[in-house]
A protein has these predicted regions:
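Active-site anion/phosphate-binding pocket segments in diverse small-molecule metabolic enzymes
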Residues: 1-128
Length: 128
């Protein structure tokens, strides 16, 4: 997690320019794990701290960068790509269908694209 100043650029080719000072989180997951590269340019979001956060810059093979704005985020905070998270405005949810709609595909393609590198957890195993 680091502060990106207004006007600074990040990512390959320095393609993303911050319009305001923002905390930016680097998340160790990318297209090799099943995050579609097209989310780079199609408004992809994840959940951190129970808020929707924009994926900024390019989805790379092993990481994404997420604009967290003014909110304080810390190393080790949970990041939800698909699923739900409690937040200050109630439960927020991102579904495979949300990404699919942005990418003009179907939810099954999103889910089937998640690679074996990503651990799977069921709600029951988390609660036990």
């Amino acid at each position: 997690v680091k502060m990106a100043r207004a006007g600074s650029r990040i990512s390959y080719g320095r393609i993303y320019k911050f319009e305001r000072d923002s905390n930016v989180a680097t998340v160790p997951i990318g297209y090799a794990d099943g995050v579609p590269r097209r989310l780079s340019t199609n408004g992809g979001e994840v959940l951190i701290g129970g808020r929707r956060r924009a994926i900024v810059g390019r989805v790379t093979m092993d990481q994404i960068m997420v604009d967290c704005g003014d909110d304080e985020v810390r190393i080790g905070d949970d990041v939800v790509l698909l699923g739900s998270q409690d937040g200050p405005d109630g439960v927020q949810t991102i579904r495979a269908e949300d990404w699919a709609d942005q990418l003009d595909t179907i939810g099954y393609e999103i889910v089937c694209g998640i690679s074996a590198r990503v651990p799977r957890f069921s709600r029951r195993s988390i609660e036990d």
